[in-house]
């Protein structure tokens, strides 16, 4: 009986650790899968006016396994190469000037419900400017002769621990970069 008093707390800690790690790992995989699917869609869409809208639809589909309210931010950004990183200002800023200077568009899960007509790079749209205006999809270089652009997708998710034994939450971030698919020869 005394042995059970010593072993039981350790056993429960072990079981809860497996439980927490499993759910955290599921969210981590959800983030990496979402950035991968989203950047592929953005790459294929190239410089069509609704490229960011198509990327958001891909992100919405790929992130279906993530619990509601965990996605904080999705950013589509211009990269200089396959090993580039997202500009640090794009990770946190909502300032139009900062986003335009860094050529990145940011989105939240609320943007999943946007209508496709709300995209198209119009900074003077009513009642709200188009969300893709900071790095307009129609300005992306898709000609082999001109040197193709690289497009990146970044995502940040906060996973809330269920038991609280390992803290309250952990943040997962991931980004993926691909060369924009050529649209013309």
Predicted stretch roles:
Residues 1-23:
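N-terminal single-pass transmembrane signal-anchor helix
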Residues 28, 36-185:
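Short, conserved structural patches
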Residues 23-33:
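Alpha-helical transmembrane segments
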């Amino acid at each position: 009986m005394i042995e059970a008093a010593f072993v039981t707390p350790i056993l429960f800690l072990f079981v809860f650790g497996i439980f927490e790690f499993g759910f955290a790992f599921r969210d981590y995989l959800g983030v990496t899968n979402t950035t991968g699917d989203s950047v592929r869609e953005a790459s294929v869409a190239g410089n069509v006016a609704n490229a960011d809208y198509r990327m958001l639809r891909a992100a919405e589909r790929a992130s279906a396994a993530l619990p509601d309210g965990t996605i904080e931010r999705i950013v589509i950004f211009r990269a200089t190469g396959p090993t580039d990183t997202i500009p640090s200002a794009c990770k946190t800023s909502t300032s139009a000037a900062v986003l335009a200077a860094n050529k990145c568009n940011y989105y939240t899960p609320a943007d999943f419900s946007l209508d496709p007509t709300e995209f198209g790079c119009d900074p003077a749209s009513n009642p709200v400017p188009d969300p893709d205006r900071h790095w307009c999809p129609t300005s992306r270089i898709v000609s082999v002769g001109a040197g193709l652009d690289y497009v990146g997708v970044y995502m940040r998710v906060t996973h809330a621990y269920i038991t609280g034994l390992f803290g309250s939450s952990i943040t997962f971030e991931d980004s993926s970069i691909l060369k924009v698919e050529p649209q013309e020869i």
